[in-house]
Amino acid sequence: GLNPLKRHSAGIACYYTGPKPALHKWPVKEFFGSYVAPRRIEGIPQGNHYDLSVNHNPVVNNTNGSVVGYKYFNFDYTYGKNNLQLLINVVPAGIDATIDVWVNSPYVSRGGVKIGSMSLNSSMKQVKTELKTGVTALKEMRGKKALFFVMKSSTAERSLCEIHDFVFVGK
């Protein structure tokens, strides 16, 4: 599994849903939830192709009810660590909202465990901002687990933020 102690681009998401299905109106698709935005780099990038300055795609259109998921992180790396936090770089969209952080599943009925939550508010500047949440429950978790971000807001059909990258930190 992926090392949660290394920063990862949000664009590696393998699971993203919205509150309702996308509409396919050729040649355009209309999305009602999260998706990975395409980015292009002019020329051939030099150096490490996995460097976030080269290889970066944000997850956008994160509306109320959207879920963004990642498989799999190896939480043996965080086992036993103190003061564990999740740091996530977002661009707020100017509305009040919450991003809940889950492991295993985004649903309790399917074995999901909520490990943290972050708030966005309408007064936040719409520039790249680092949000933090304590994720102390990871201190006791081991093995490969899926990670999910669940978007919540009372404002329907408006993106809460763009998600750029994230990393877990601890001592």
What spans do the regions from the language model cover?
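Extracytoplasmic
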Residues: 1-171
